[in-house]
Amino acid sequence: MYAHLAQMLNLLVTPSSGPATVFTDGPIPDNDAMKEALGKVDALKFNVETGKVIRLVPAVAPDIGVTVVVEGGKEYKLGYLGHKPYTVVAGKAMITRLGAEIEENPVMGEHVKTVDPLGSTNVKGVFVAGDAATPMKAVANAIGTGERYCRSWDRAAVDNGGHGEDLSLEEVHINTRPSSTATEFDKTHHIIEKMYPLESVRHLVVEQSQLCYILFGAVLAYAGWRWVLRLDILNEAITDLMSNLLNYYLTRRYPIHHSETGQQIPGRSYRWPNGQGDQGKFLDGIENRAQWAKEHGRIYRIWAGTTPEVVLQTPEHIKLVFRDSDRHSKAVNNDSGYLMGQVLGQCLGLISGGDWRRVREVCEAAFTHSKAINYLDLIHSRVGDYLQKCTALQRGTLNPADDFKFLPFLVVGDILYGHMTQEMEDELRQMAPLRERLFQFVIRGGLARYTWSQYLPTEANHALREFRSRWVAFNQAAYCRARERGATATPVYQLFTAVSDGMITAANAYQTLDEMLFANLDVTLGGLSWNPVFLAANPAVQEELYENITAAQEAEGPAMPMYLQDSSTYLAACILESSRLKPLAAFSVPQAAPTARVLDGYVIAGGTNYIVDAYALNVEHEFWGPDRHEYRPGRFLGVKGADLRYHMWRFGFGPRQCLGKYVADLILRVFLVHLVRNWRLGFEDGQIADSREWKRDLDAWITHPTIELTCTPRGARA
């Protein structure tokens, strides 16, 4: 508990304040739990004082703070002092008579045991709410920490003539020995009243009462809405009414007019509560984009929640918008609302300006073009081991998205944390389904878009709390491991060192690691899983690639470092062609230009978010010729990267391209080399050859195939 409190206090540490100090009030017990807690404290670079605390001396007005005096006369002058006291349940006798069960924790204190999020107890009809129902007491923590705590000491000194009377440790109940009698509890309560005047306490009670009414009203509204949703006719009528009213308001709140005709930009009407995002953009985006383009032309507007997004489909428009992409800002929370903000809102890919530059400065060294090749042996080892153990390859039938799901996951994990232990791999595999379920709530939108939804007992909030708790614990342990091993080049070490130095926030670190591992699991898997499908559907291309790989292997050996770094090879062309025909998603993530743009006569204000229709650009545009729908990797041979600029969306445009693009390409190339030189891929009988008709996972926000392939060993493995 105290280690957790120390982590919270770490957010207040600044370069001028110096490291925080943890007072143990005596010798530290020698047990595993305490060793783990000290490991966390040590990782934060905190000082630890093991001397017995003798007294606390409050500052004299107008100064604030408190001086902690320990055995031997050593003094610590602090501006902020926090403590979590042992607490007992007030009205315990009444609760016991009711038969409600009271739990006791040797550190946290007592609380009434609840059996569900609604506060039910073991006694039917008896409910409990507030601090009585949780080990983590909000009021006790508020009293025990913060600026008001220090000011209250000053107030106590003034009440005693301004002499700064010393208050002993026993008087303020700051030690960890439990209060076992009512007399001791009353004594502590008396001291608290001394520290907080009655007006402050009354104000606190009023604020709590108001909050309770707000929460109660929110729960009632939520319950009422859930009931309304069961009545389909009424639900549809309410949705239509809300949609029409909000569409009328939003189109006037965010006008986009033609400079000559004055007409509004064409586009979709707002549909409550999500508009057209995220489900409309991602889950159903492939079907929707064709219909929307047909109805509205080559430039139009959609709504992500209540935020407008302008859809770009042509290289000319993209060039006009992205000419100053270094000054663009990403949409707040990706235009996906509150829950997205809690999961990835502070990650590298979704922040802008100075925050983005600081986080990128910490991360980029591990993902540069020159650094990526250093991971070649690691990637070869992971890929070879994974494919050798893949039961799908052994049985002769393969579903690429399912059977190769964790391959890029494990490679990236080794890069982020250093070579992972089996325990680390197991924990990440166990967290992956929870993270996937959490992101499904993000994509579905609805209540999860709104900040007030955090107060509701929803499954999304439960999943968020569970994932966040496990993710923080995993990364804290991984950081300690990296520090102990001297793995200072790993991103986990660099990120949390930057947090300690005050360069970035803890949220930046946790969410950027999440983005690199879990968010990019879907992204990398999307690119990795479509390549085998295209090769299986095109045997001639597959055989040409096999011959190309064999020749490179004979020239360089099995590792083929030069071949794998070369972006002009047939292997690289196959990957590009697959990415062209099957973009990761129908639309790019939203970002805004800093100044106004005029597109086809429509004046679009600075700060308006744009998204790119990837299929319109990658597949439908005439740049790709009459065979634009066919898989022909040769179209990329001899073509320079500059010639493709603004004609193909893959890693983005300009300085804000995907940080991990070099590592991602290397993973894809090594994977295809191992796969093609050892197995021959094919389609099952009756499988459709036209890629436009191939089935995909309709529940995945990134395009993943749901296609069974046949795989036959080519002979002795290389």
Curated annotation (Swiss-Prot):
Keywords: FAD, Flavoprotein, Glycoprotein, Iron, Metal-binding, Monooxygenase, Multifunctional enzyme, NADP, Oxidoreductase, Signal. Binds 1 FAD per subunit. SUPFAM superfamilies: Cytochrome P450, FAD/NAD(P)-binding domain. Disruption phenotype: Impairs the production of acetylaranotin and accumulates the intermediate cyclo-L-Phe-L-Phe. Residues 216-718 are annotated as: Cytochrome P450 monooxygenase ataC. The keyword Metal-binding applies. FAD binds at residues 72-90, 109-114, 515-516. Its cofactor is FAD; heme. Bimodular acetylaranotin synthesis protein; part of the gene cluster that mediates the biosynthesis of acetylaranotin, a member of the epipolythiodioxopiperazine (ETP) class of toxins characterized by a disulfide-bridged cyclic dipeptide. The first step of acetylaranotin biosynthesis is performed by the NRPS ataP which produces diketopiperazine cyclo-L-Phe-L-Phe via the condensation of 2 phenylalanines (L-Phe). The ataC domain of ataTC then catalyzes the formation of bishydroxylation of cyclo-L-Phe-L-Phe. This is Bimodular acetylaranotin synthesis protein ataTC. It comes from Aspergillus terreus (strain NIH 2624 / FGSC A1156).
